[in-house]
């Protein structure tokens, strides 16, 4: 598993030399700019809602102060009211002040849930906008190269983690930021009240004490976030191991291979690798700095309280001022603690937003080094002549080995071309280049002489129906799974059924509880799952649906890997009819498949080493003939363990073993 690298940590934290100027710059980068990003997010919540919540939070900040003032005046009026009796003016004043205090208290209780409900609406709006942005960023690249970049994966993981756990999201941070309006409005009002009621120096002293407490809390969280950045890679491992053990994907192997204990130990080890850095940082982050800041703050706050008591003892302030001073200082000190509605969510959101910003920058950096996507329309009927790989070379990003080395290959229009070779020969890479999932390192892929990089990628891909061996099993209905082959056109049920019939899966699908509308997942009510071979036919039907919608190229990458030999033979007996007039590329390790192709190409070491018809290549006695004979011998002895009934393959395949022996004479 990949762990965080030094480059993943905030640069200033790792490299900044001591000095006020650098420290100030680092603080701005770490604490100020991320908060400004959160402030800018407020616009996606709606101006009216944000303004209303701001006013509401100002009110929620002032109402507790009004309650403190009212109750303090109430305490001061009690002696006069008691002396005057219930019919006195002093008693009337006492009653009026009590009603004011009660009103302030009741308004606080009424407005708080209103603020919470509106805050949730703001959170949903902001988080929804950011989810859309993150999704748009990951869908933006034309190819899949950026999606395999380790730095991009780290930033994406950090960006979406808050959304996955649904707390500490940027939307919650926006709500928490507005909540700080209430907190700091209250603090400012209390500083003024203490200054007026007790002494002007006491107000700023209490305010400074509260800010010191707050700096200790927020400073610790900010330093903790640096540690969090260092363990992002390990966090991904923890998440992965948790998913493996909590879903049914690996349930069979976990039990059959006895992996329960091993997975539990691995999970604990990964989790400890995440937690240990925090434990090591705890004393440095909290113990000494927090004790120092708390001590200074308590001295300031305690000094204000003692000064208030001295003034009351010497008669310089009355009972009202004493009550007001004590209550105001106590309420102000309570503002120096941890803010659950703001602190954690804001810190996590700053991590997410910083990761999102780095994700944008990394994608921009990767795309800047790539050729801009073409915009030309794909001519109708393309390819009319041929698809050509013209001296194509390719190396995967970050890899040292060349996968394709000057490939010269022609796929004649309307014909079936097969590509064979050992694992790692570059067969699937050809498919990725043809689908523009990658761009060639050198050379070009051409359709009727035109570089396909000049075409609009989306238009070009509509011309290509692809079946990958590792196709996706979507948790959708059977009809939707097939119709995804041409998602750009309205779903045509008749065409869906026809594609299913051609792929040999229609009968099985129609027998499901809801037919084509049955969800292909047991996670949904009335849903079911299919066998591997049935899913393979769904994938084939998906590609055939694309052909029905106008695709001109069919690419089959190990198309029958999950079918038994007889089913494979039956499928390829129909293959020529299904793909008549279609330019097709067939990749398979089974020679019983490729022998039916019009043209066969042998790849080895990233180069084309042989090409021709099946009969011609067998007669040549070269690389293809040797591999064919080796596989035929395994078929004849029933040694190909991945096929059902493989001992009878010679019958199903029309005497493949006999033909191989004949070709080797």
Regions found by a protein language model. Name each.
Residues 3-5, 573, 581, 586-590, ...:
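C-terminal portion of ABC ATPase nucleotide-binding domains
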Residues 1-64, 96, 115, 152-189, ...:
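Membrane-integrated ABC transporters
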Residues 325-362:
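Cytosolic ends of transmembrane helices, especially the final helix of ABC transmembrane type-1 domains
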Residues 506-538, 542-559, 563, 638-639:
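ABC-fold ATPase nucleotide-binding domain signature/coupling loops
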Residues 446, 479-525, 581, 619:
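ABC ATPase nucleotide-binding domain helical subdomain, centered on the C-loop/LSGGQ "ABC signature"
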Residues 43-44, 160-173, 233, 255-299, ...:
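An intracellular "coupling" helix at the cytosolic face of ABC transporter transmembrane type-1 domains
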Residues 2-36, 124-171, 234-243, 247-277, ...:
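Extended non-transmembrane interhelical loops and adjacent amphipathic helices
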Residues 51-111, 184, 188, 195-221, ...:
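Transmembrane helix-loop-helix hairpins at lipid-water interfaces of multipass membrane proteins
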């Amino acid at each position: 598993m990949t762990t965080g690298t030094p480059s993943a940590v905030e640069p200033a934290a790792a490299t900044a030399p001591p000095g006020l100027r650098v420290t100030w710059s680092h603080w701005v980068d770490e604490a100020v700019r991320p908060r400004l990003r959160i402030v800018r997010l407020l616009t996606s919540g709606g101006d009216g809602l944000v303004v209303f919540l701001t006013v509401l939070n100002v009110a929620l900040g002032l109402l507790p102060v009004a309650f403190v003032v009212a109750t303090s005046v109430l305490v001061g009026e009690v002696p006069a009211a008691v002396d005057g009796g219930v019919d006195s003016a002093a008693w009337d004043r006492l009653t009026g002040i009590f009603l004011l205090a009660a009103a302030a208290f009741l308004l606080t209780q009424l407005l708080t849930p209103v603020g919470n409900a509106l805050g949730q609406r703001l959170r949903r709006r902001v988080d929804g906008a950011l989810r859309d942005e993150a999704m748009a960023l990951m869908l933006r690249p034309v190819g899949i190269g950026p999606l395999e970049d380790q730095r991009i994966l780290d930033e994406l993981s950090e960006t979406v983690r808050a959304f996955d756990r649904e707390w500490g999201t940027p939307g919650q941070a926006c709500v928490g930021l507005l909540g700080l309006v209430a907190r700091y409005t209250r603090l400012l009002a209390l500083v003024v009240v203490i200054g007026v009621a007790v002494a002007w120096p006491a107000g700023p002293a209490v305010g400074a004490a509260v800010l010191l407490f707050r700096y200790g809390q927020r400073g610790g969280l900010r330093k903790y976030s640096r540690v969090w950045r260092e363990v992002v890679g390990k966090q991904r491992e923890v998440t992965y191991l948790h998913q493996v053990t909590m879903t049914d994907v690996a349930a069979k192997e976990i039990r059959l291979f006895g992996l329960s204990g091993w997975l539990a130990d691995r999970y604990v080890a990964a989790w400890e690798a995440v937690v240990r850095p925090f434990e090591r940082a705890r004393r440095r982050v909290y113990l000494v700095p927090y004790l120092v800041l708390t001590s200074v703050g308590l001295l300031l706050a305690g000094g204000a309280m003692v000064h208030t008591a001295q003034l009351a003892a010497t008669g310089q302030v009355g009972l009202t001022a004493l009550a007001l001073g004590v209550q105001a200082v106590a309420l102000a000190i309570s503002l120096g603690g941890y803010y659950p509605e703001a602190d954690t969510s804001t810190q996590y959101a700053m991590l997410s937003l910083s990761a999102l910003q780095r994700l944008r920058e990394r994608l921009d950096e990767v795309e800047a080094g790539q050729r801009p996507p073409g915009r030309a329309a794909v001519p109708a009927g393309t390819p009319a002549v041929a698809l050509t790989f013209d001296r194509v070379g390719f190396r995967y990003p970050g890899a040292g080995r060349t996968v394709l080395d000057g490939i010269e290959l022609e796929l004649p229009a309307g014909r079936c071309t097969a590509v064979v070779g050992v694992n790692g020969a570059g067969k699937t890479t050809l498919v990725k280049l043809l689908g523009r999932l990658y761009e060639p390192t050198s050379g070009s892929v051409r359709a009727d002489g035109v570089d396909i990089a000049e075409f609009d990628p989306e238009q070009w891909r509509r011309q290509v129906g692809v079946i990958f061996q590792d196709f996706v099993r979507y948790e959708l209905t059977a009809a939707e799974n097939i119709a995804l082959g041409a998602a750009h056109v309205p779903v045509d049920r008749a065409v869906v059924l026809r594609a299913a019939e051609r792929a040999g899966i229609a009968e099985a699908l129609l027998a499901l509880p809801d037919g084509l509308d049955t969800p292909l997942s047991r996670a949904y009510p009335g849903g079911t799952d299919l066998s591997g071979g049935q899913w393979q036919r769904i994938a084939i039907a998906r590609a055939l649906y694309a052909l029905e919608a106008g695709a001109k190229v069919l690419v089959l990458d190990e198309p029958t890997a999950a079918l038994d030999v007889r089913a494979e033979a039956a499928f390829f007996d129909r293959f020529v009819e299904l793909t008549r007039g279609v330019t097709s590329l067939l990749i398979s390790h089974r020679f019983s498949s490729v022998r039916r192709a019009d043209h066969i190409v042998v790849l080895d070491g990233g180069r084309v080493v042989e090409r021709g018809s099946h009969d011609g290549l067998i007669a040549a006695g070269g690389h293809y003939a040797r591999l064919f004979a080796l596989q035929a011998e395994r078929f004849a002895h029933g040694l190909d363990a991945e096929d059902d009934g493989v001992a009878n393959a010679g019958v199903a395949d029309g005497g493949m073993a006999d033909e191989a022996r004949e070709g080797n004479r």
